[in-house]
Amino acid sequence: MDLTNYIASIKDYPKAGITFRDISPLMADGKAYSYAIREIAQYACDKDIDMVVGPEARGFIIGCPVAVELGIGFAPVRKPGKLPRDVVSADYEKEYGLDTLTMHADAIKPGQRVLIVDDLLATGGTVKATIEMIEKLGGIVAGCAFLIELEGLNGRHAIRNYDYKVLMQFPG
């Protein structure tokens, strides 16, 4: 199935010169959404994964059904102030400065094998911060999976030492 047919490209959103890749049409089509989830789960099935981790918000949309498909748990990565218990955090660079991500300090146990799932790999800042937190907790990043990679933004460089899968590529 060609999943690129289920991605809407919106020019000049959220600002001039940017083409936003909207996954809403993919999620609205049960067959395409299910296919994408199964493809990621298939990638993970031989990696002995213990936990799926996904950054907010679209990482939840993809990561949770992957975790269900694999029969394992899901741990959310959130912005500061959104998680109620003790957290670990990691800073990452955005286009106009630094931002921070957090996850519960007890979300990953030492030695657990983790699959990071998100909708988009662009510059790699989000996934790099997520990797940092997982490893700080003693987890092992067994793989990363993304619906879309924006080529030319060097996101692959951030995960060059990790196994990963991308279902679709678009110009960055």
Curated annotation (Swiss-Prot):
Q: Give the Enzyme Commission number.
A: 2.4.2.7
GO biological process, alphabetically ordered: adenine salvage; AMP salvage; purine ribonucleoside salvage
Q: Which GO terms describe its molecular function?
A: adenine binding; adenine phosphoribosyltransferase activity; AMP binding
Disulfide bridge positions per record: none
Which compartment or compartments is the protein found in? Cytoplasm
Q: Which InterPro entries match?
A: Ade_phspho_trans, PRibTrfase_dom, PRTase-like, UPRTase/APRTase
Q: Which GO terms describe its cellular component?
A: cytoplasm
Q: Which UniProt keywords apply?
A: Cytoplasm, Glycosyltransferase, Purine salvage, Transferase
Q: Does the record's keyword annotation contain Glycosyltransferase?
A: yes
By its UniProt entry, which SUPFAM superfamilies does this protein fall under? PRTase-like (SSF53271)
Q: In which pathway does it act?
A: Purine metabolism; AMP biosynthesis via salvage pathway; AMP from adenine: step 1/1
> Looking at its record, which EC class is this enzyme?
transferase
Catalysed reactions, semicolon-separated: AMP + diphosphate = 5-phospho-alpha-D-ribose 1-diphosphate + adenine
Task: Provide the assembly information.
Answer: Homodimer.
Q: Which family does it belong to?
A: Belongs to the purine/pyrimidine phosphoribosyltransferase family.
Its biological purpose: Catalyzes a salvage reaction resulting in the formation of AMP, that is energically less costly than de novo synthesis.
Identification of the protein by name: Adenine phosphoribosyltransferase
Q: Lineage of this protein's species? A: Bacteria, Bacillati, Bacillota, Bacilli, Lactobacillales
Q: Which gene encodes it?
A: apt
